[in-house]
Amino acid sequence: MFQPAQAPWINPGVVIHDAGAPVDELIAKFANSAARRGFLVAACAQRGETMVDLVSGEPLAGTPLEVAARTLRVAMRDDADLAVIGGFDGFRHAAVELTASIGQGATQGMPVLTTIPDGRVLEWHDFIGHGGTMIAPTTRALWRWWGPERLYRDLALGVAADEVRQIAVGPRWLMVQGPAGAGLAYLPRNSRELVGRIAELKRKSLRQLAELSGSWDPLEMAVGIAAINAHYNRFDLEGEMGNGASAFGHEAGRVVVIGAFPGLSETLSNPQVIEADPRPGEYPTVAMDSLLPGCAAAVVASSTLINRNLPRILRLAQGSRIALVGPATPLTHRLFHYGCEILGGLVVRDARGLGEAIRAGALPREFGRFGHYLHLKREDAPAESGCRFRARP
């Protein structure tokens, strides 16, 4: 049995800042955001004469160096998801005192973050060598350091331990229904094995099913994504109509599409389409490495979430406008920090009817009879006229 998929190693990060800049506020905001999402975070920084826990806001007893060492010790003991030590002096002291692993090794590469004024960068290099990452003092740069590979656990952490009310398995698609919504996922292989496990899976909570998104088994992975969507794509979710891809219809630069979808030619002008089984005029999957860097925008099929290509795509298209679209897209703001600007997915209205259709082999073009395609946009996305829609239960 394989261990659950782990996010890759992250090099220790240092935020480079001007002397006197309010960098502790930046790292506190980042630490709090990670903690609110459910990640285990140990974080401290100095405010005035007092050391403070950046997650709780409570003062911490001891000298700055003592508190830094204690924070890193607790993070390692608890196998925290993130350790934040405000100020390079405290970080260096803690690492040396505890002989903490700053390179490949212990704790599966626990992300460690600190700060340093730009005039002391050489001290960072002398201490860390070539194994560290320098980070610009922006929220977006911090999330890029954190990495899109962690989006799966992020999504699962937000799912409530609710009752699973229905699991519908068809030849190519799967639906999981919870008390507040229903979610879909594409099945990457024959579903026969999954059909025999429905009773077992239905006894689990929605949160337990969502945790299967960390599985290496493709069918379990699909169950996990469907459960995630059952939580976030609520029956009463509000958004703008359509999958949102039309927002890229007037882009001046190249628009890359990962996975063709109905109405593509009417939505986008001269897109560069990448498909696993390309037709004439389309590109194979290997072309992602050449086409995504430097593109103006990318429209990405939600199936990439299930086959685990999405984190790679987000890295390759870093800095470009990105829309994640398709029936299996989780409609949650959690994905915006990982680089998505637009999220277009399905909000189910008739879960019973859709479940029956999926068992009978329905294809995505038929799903609209049982719900509505809506999209969410990141706050800083360019304005575009659209029609708001509230899904009905």
Language model segments and positions:
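Short, conserved loop/helix-junction motifs that constitute active-site signature segments
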Residues: 103-109, 267-268, 291-293, 314-319
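Short, charged N-terminal beta->alpha structural module
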Residues: 256-276
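Electropositive, gly/pro-rich neighborhoods at or near active sites that engage anionic ligands
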Residues: 2, 16-20, 36, 47, ...
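Glycine-rich P-loop/Walker A and Walker A-like loops and their local beta1-loop-alpha1 context
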Residues: 2-35
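Short acidic low-complexity segments
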Residues: 242-246, 282-294
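Conserved nucleotide-sensing/catalytic segment adjacent to the nucleotide-binding pocket
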Residues: 48-99, 103, 296-299
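Accessory, usually C-terminal, subdomains that scaffold auxiliary metal cofactors
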Residues: 304-373
